[in-house]
Amino acid sequence: MALTRLLLPISILWFCFYSSHTILQKDPLLICVNGDPGFDQRAYPTYFGPILDEFSSIMGFEPSILSLERFNPVGGPETSPDTDISVDDFGARGDGTDDTKAFEKAWKDACSSGSVLIVPENKNYLLKQITFSGPCKSDLRVKIRGTIEASSDQSDWVGHNRKRWIEFEDISNLTLEGGGTSNGNGETWWDSSCKRKKSLPCKSAPTALTFRSCKNLIVSDLSIKDSQKMHLSFDKCQDVIASNLMVTAPEHSPNTDGIHITGTQRIHVMNSVIGTGDDCISIESGSKMVIATNITCGPGHGISIGSLGDRNSEAHVSGVLVDGGNLFDTTNGLRIKTWQGGSGSAKNIKFQNIVMHNVTNPIIIDQYYCDSKDPCPEQESAVKVSNVAYMNIRGTSASEVAVKFDCSKSSPCQGYIVGNINLVGNGGKETTMSCSNIVQGLLREGLSTFLFMKRRVHECSY
């Protein structure tokens, strides 16, 4: 049963990529052409051919690439012994006193022995900044059943890494689960943020849970709330499943991204509810083969790729699929954001089967993103955005412009499919689509294809 339960997410992960690729190959506008007899995909073979080839190169890989090593019965790593240890066995009290040392001792034992590490239920464990490092002896399972809390006193962070609260690094074959809660007690950090009080200097604040350079990782069935800054970060990880997560913070808590993905390859975020003061999911440079399915988002800033290219940096993101979800009262829906002056690419991206509920900017590409106190200067270079598809997206927009593509003049967007988009204003008001600086064609020739509210759109300019 345990093996079956663990294999299920892998099967779902492969199915999502395979089914998306198969449908796109057969007819990328299959849903939206119903009721639009004037549109015939076959009339645009030079357009669809290259974009399908590009998507195939990302989505057409073998299933074995997505298999976590721990599930490979031949030559796989040693399995963990059936032994449980509790942090209480190492002196943790769970009564609000500092349990950091006890957790460090418990981790050292579990990492060296392969035992299952338990954080007992019905207790509140106070932790200061802590890093759980590998490599470990074998597969490792951590079950958080109780509550882990951060100190709300910022003086406790003196001499520690202010950018991270709980960090897991250089670990392979780790499962973190259990139904418990991580509470960052972030209120004091939010109150001292320059985003909330413009007169204050901007200082770093901790991310609640960071996974850095981890491989074959499962994070599931956890509640993560009120982080000091970002809630959950995957940094330079490979082969990750994040499922059944509840991530929450108040709407006006600054920089509290729900799930942050950077430099990470082959990750599937699924069946999760995220509502924070910033992006529900943010995908940044170095990330490839990212899937997000069945996501409930709101409040927050939506699901974002970026920001990319800040401080004239080079950034690359490719192979992103967002499939299925609901966004409630977010400031943005599906967003790609890049800074002027950057370089690199964001490509082979597909958003589909999303429902918007009173979302201010349901679909937006902003290549003039500027999150700065001072105006950002005009710059020539830009991150190249190409091969992007938006399919079967409906619901209500809080603004008249429901779809906005504000692409770079110097590096225009290239290769777009927008189909079966049905976004109306509150009360059924009609919405519009705005786009600028999109190349009329994909890579070589042909027409970019836009179907908005079941109508062909021709007014995109370049």
UniProtKB/Swiss-Prot annotation:
GO terms for molecular function: polygalacturonase activity. The keyword Secreted applies. Belongs to the glycosyl hydrolase 28 family. Acts in concert with the pectinesterase, in the ripening process. Is involved in cell wall metabolism, specifically in polyuronide degradation. Its main location: secreted. The active site is at D278 (proton donor), H301. Pfam families: Glyco_hydro_28 (PF00295). PANTHER family: PTHR31375. Its EC number is 3.2.1.15. This is Polygalacturonase. It catalyses: (1,4-alpha-D-galacturonosyl)n+m + H2O = (1,4-alpha-D-galacturonosyl)n + (1,4-alpha-D-galacturonosyl)m. It is found in: Secreted; Secreted, Cell wall. Disulfide bonds join C280-C297, C407-C413, C435-C460. Glycans are attached at N173, N294, N358. Keywords: Cell wall, Cell wall biogenesis/degradation, Disulfide bond, Fruit ripening, Glycoprotein, Glycosidase, Hydrolase, Repeat, Secreted, Signal.
